[in-house]
């Protein structure tokens, strides 16, 4: 199995998982359950509910539970629970929808409900016990599926766009053509729009745009119309209209003037 397909399979399993966290704590089917020892890189689809699990330590043995959250463009956030005083404390936690799954004295896991692009970052759960400290970290990468569009522009040029994907999608053409340009537009939320423009010879009737992305691949086809023409700009169209109207006005003016002078000459001859 290729690496991209393996990664897609992992993402699908994460987004559809109803497994329990390590330690025997059952999660509902509305959550994607993420579990591993140490530090892992974890891709997660946007708009799902994710649960990040603490190390599997019996709650009766814990002293303090701390979640450290480092997000892009945000100060470091800390969520802590102290068992002795049954107190919870938060520091610099401004991003919404990141909470304890339930009461931390019953479940020390963290939930993100639902995931969006602001939740990209590093999450570490630390459990302090009489036997030492245990931690589990997650490098969370939020994935956004791009919207794919394909259309024909001027002449016989096909344009394929993968709109607001995260990370940037890759575009290829079938059959292969001489790509005129590939542009990437970056947005503030971390998504990227990729636009590929490809001209084709007149004998090509149908072309296919293939978009590759970590969330899955997609292909669209379009039938090329060799007779399709579009004006260069609205200003050019306006100038053409004005030119036609002006020409018509001049013709009417000349005709009216000719008739007028003919009548004057006729009156002079009669007199």
Swiss-Prot record:
Residues 1-23 form the signal peptide. It comes from Homo sapiens. Residues 46-132 form the Ig-like V-type domain. GO terms for molecular function: signaling receptor activity. It is a single-pass type I membrane protein. The keyword Transmembrane helix applies. The keyword Membrane applies. Residues 261-271 are cytoplasmic. It is found in: Membrane. Disulfide bonds join 160-209. Keywords: Disulfide bond, Glycoprotein, Immunoglobulin domain, Membrane, Receptor, Signal, Transmembrane, Transmembrane helix. The chain crosses the membrane at residues 240-260. Glycans are attached at residues 30, 39, 86, 92, 189, 217. GO terms for cellular component: external side of plasma membrane. GO terms for biological process: regulation of neuroinflammatory response. This is Cell surface glycoprotein CD200 receptor 2.
């Amino acid at each position: 199995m290729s690496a991209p397909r393996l990664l897609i399979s992992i993402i699908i399993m994460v987004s559809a998982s109803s497994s329990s966290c390590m330690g025997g704590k059952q999660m509902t089917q509305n959550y994607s359950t993420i579990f591993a020892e140490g530090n892992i890189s974890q891709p997660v689809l946007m708009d799902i509910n994710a649960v990040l699990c603490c190390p599997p330590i019996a709650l009766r043995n814990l002293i303090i539970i701390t979640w450290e959250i480092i997000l892009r463009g945000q100060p470091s956030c800390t969520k802590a629970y102290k068992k002795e005083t049954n107190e919870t404390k938060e520091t610099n936690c401004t991003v919404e929808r990141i909470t304890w799954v339930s009461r931390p004295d019953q479940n020390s896991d963290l939930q993100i409900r639902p995931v969006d692009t602001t939740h990209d970052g590093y999450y570490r759960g630390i459990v302090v016990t009489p036997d030492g400290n245990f931690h589990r970290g997650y490098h969370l990468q939020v994935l956004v599926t791009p919207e794919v569009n394909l259309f024909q522009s001027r002449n016989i040029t096909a344009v394929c766009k993968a709109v607001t994907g995260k990370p940037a999608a890759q575009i290829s053409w079938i059959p292969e053509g001489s790509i005129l340009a590939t542009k990437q537009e970056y947005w503030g939320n971390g998504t990227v729009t990729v636009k590929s423009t490809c001209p084709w010879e007149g004998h090509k009737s149908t072309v296919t745009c293939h978009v590759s992305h970590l969330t899955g691949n997609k292909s669209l086809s379009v039938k090329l119309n060799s007779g399709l023409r579009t004006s260069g700009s609205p200003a050019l169209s306006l100038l053409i209209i004005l030119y036609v109207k002006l020409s018509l006005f001049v013709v009417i003016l000349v005709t009216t003037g000719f008739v007028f002078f003919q009548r004057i000459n006729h009156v002079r001859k009669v007199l």
